[in-house]
Amino acid sequence: MEKKIIKINDKDYVLEMTRNSIKWLEASGFSIDEFYKKPLTYFDLIWTSLFIANNKDVAQNPNLALKLIETYEKEGKKPAEIVKFGIEQYKAFMNALADIDLNLDEKIEIVE
Protein backbone atom coordinates (compact mmCIF):
# COMPACT_ATOMS: atom_id res chain seq x y z
CA MET A 1 0.00 0.00 0.00
CA GLU A 2 1.08 3.55 -0.64
CA LYS A 3 1.96 6.07 2.03
CA LYS A 4 1.39 9.80 1.99
CA ILE A 5 3.13 12.35 4.19
CA ILE A 6 1.31 15.53 5.12
CA LYS A 7 2.39 18.41 7.33
CA ILE A 8 0.07 19.87 9.95
CA ASN A 9 1.33 22.46 12.44
CA ASP A 10 4.88 21.88 11.18
CA LYS A 11 4.67 18.17 12.05
CA ASP A 12 4.88 15.40 9.46
CA TYR A 13 2.20 12.72 9.56
CA VAL A 14 2.63 9.47 7.65
CA LEU A 15 -0.74 8.33 6.34
CA GLU A 16 -1.34 4.75 5.28
CA MET A 17 -4.22 2.32 4.87
CA THR A 18 -3.23 -0.98 6.47
CA ARG A 19 -4.99 -4.19 7.37
CA ASN A 20 -5.41 -2.90 10.95
CA SER A 21 -6.75 0.47 9.87
CA ILE A 22 -9.26 -1.28 7.61
CA LYS A 23 -10.32 -3.48 10.54
CA TRP A 24 -10.77 -0.31 12.61
CA LEU A 25 -12.79 1.29 9.80
CA GLU A 26 -15.09 -1.70 9.48
CA ALA A 27 -15.47 -2.06 13.25
CA SER A 28 -16.51 1.62 13.27
CA GLY A 29 -19.32 0.82 10.84
CA PHE A 30 -17.71 1.86 7.56
CA SER A 31 -19.09 0.42 4.33
CA ILE A 32 -17.87 1.67 0.96
CA ASP A 33 -21.32 0.89 -0.48
CA GLU A 34 -22.91 3.26 2.04
CA PHE A 35 -20.47 6.14 1.53
CA TYR A 36 -22.96 8.38 -0.27
CA LYS A 37 -25.64 7.77 2.36
CA LYS A 38 -23.41 9.00 5.20
CA PRO A 39 -20.72 11.09 3.50
CA LEU A 40 -19.71 13.26 6.47
CA THR A 41 -19.48 10.36 8.90
CA TYR A 42 -17.49 8.23 6.48
CA PHE A 43 -15.32 11.17 5.41
CA ASP A 44 -14.17 11.56 9.02
CA LEU A 45 -13.72 7.80 9.47
CA ILE A 46 -11.51 7.45 6.40
CA TRP A 47 -9.46 10.50 7.40
CA THR A 48 -8.95 9.04 10.88
CA SER A 49 -8.14 5.54 9.63
CA LEU A 50 -5.22 6.85 7.59
CA PHE A 51 -3.51 8.10 10.77
CA ILE A 52 -3.92 4.92 12.84
CA ALA A 53 -1.01 2.85 11.49
CA ASN A 54 1.79 5.37 11.99
CA ASN A 55 0.59 7.92 14.53
CA LYS A 56 0.27 6.55 18.07
CA ASP A 57 -1.42 9.68 19.41
CA VAL A 58 -4.31 9.28 16.97
CA ALA A 59 -4.44 5.50 17.44
CA GLN A 60 -4.96 6.09 21.17
CA ASN A 61 -7.33 9.03 20.68
CA PRO A 62 -9.14 9.03 17.29
CA ASN A 63 -10.79 12.37 18.15
CA LEU A 64 -7.37 13.96 17.68
CA ALA A 65 -7.71 13.23 13.95
CA LEU A 66 -10.83 15.40 13.84
CA LYS A 67 -8.87 18.30 15.33
CA LEU A 68 -6.15 17.70 12.75
CA ILE A 69 -8.65 17.84 9.89
CA GLU A 70 -9.83 21.27 11.10
CA THR A 71 -6.26 22.54 11.35
CA TYR A 72 -5.37 21.10 7.94
CA GLU A 73 -8.33 22.92 6.43
CA LYS A 74 -7.45 26.19 8.21
CA GLU A 75 -3.97 25.94 6.71
CA GLY A 76 -5.63 26.21 3.29
CA LYS A 77 -5.23 22.55 2.41
CA LYS A 78 -7.89 20.19 1.09
CA PRO A 79 -8.78 17.24 3.34
CA ALA A 80 -10.95 15.85 0.53
CA GLU A 81 -7.79 15.01 -1.43
CA ILE A 82 -6.51 12.97 1.52
CA VAL A 83 -9.85 11.19 1.92
CA LYS A 84 -9.85 10.44 -1.81
CA PHE A 85 -6.41 8.86 -1.34
CA GLY A 86 -7.83 6.81 1.54
CA ILE A 87 -10.74 5.56 -0.55
CA GLU A 88 -8.38 4.62 -3.38
CA GLN A 89 -6.16 2.71 -0.95
CA TYR A 90 -9.15 0.95 0.62
CA LYS A 91 -10.41 -0.13 -2.81
CA ALA A 92 -6.92 -1.27 -3.84
CA PHE A 93 -6.71 -3.40 -0.71
CA MET A 94 -10.12 -4.95 -1.37
CA ASN A 95 -9.22 -5.60 -5.02
CA ALA A 96 -5.98 -7.29 -3.93
CA LEU A 97 -7.97 -9.59 -1.65
CA ALA A 98 -10.27 -10.54 -4.51
CA ASP A 99 -7.39 -11.13 -6.93
CA ILE A 100 -6.29 -14.52 -5.65
CA ASP A 101 -4.36 -16.49 -8.24
CA LEU A 102 -5.68 -20.03 -7.88
CA ASN A 103 -3.71 -22.82 -9.47
CA LEU A 104 -6.36 -24.47 -11.62
CA ASP A 105 -4.46 -27.78 -11.50
CA GLU A 106 -4.65 -27.85 -7.73
CA LYS A 107 -7.05 -30.42 -6.35
CA ILE A 108 -9.27 -29.17 -3.57
CA GLU A 109 -10.69 -31.70 -1.18
CA ILE A 110 -13.95 -30.83 0.53
CA VAL A 111 -14.28 -32.47 3.93
CA GLU A 112 -17.63 -32.47 5.60
Predicted regions and their residues:
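Charged interaction scaffolds used for protein-protein
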Residues: 1-8, 22-23, 27-37, 57-112
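Short, isolated positions in well-ordered beta-strands
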Residues: 13-15
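Residue-level signal for threonine
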Residues: 18
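Acidic/histidine-rich catalytic cores and adjacent linkers
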Residues: 40
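Short, hydrophobic/amphipathic alpha-helical patches that form generic packing surfaces
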Residues: 43-53, 84, 88
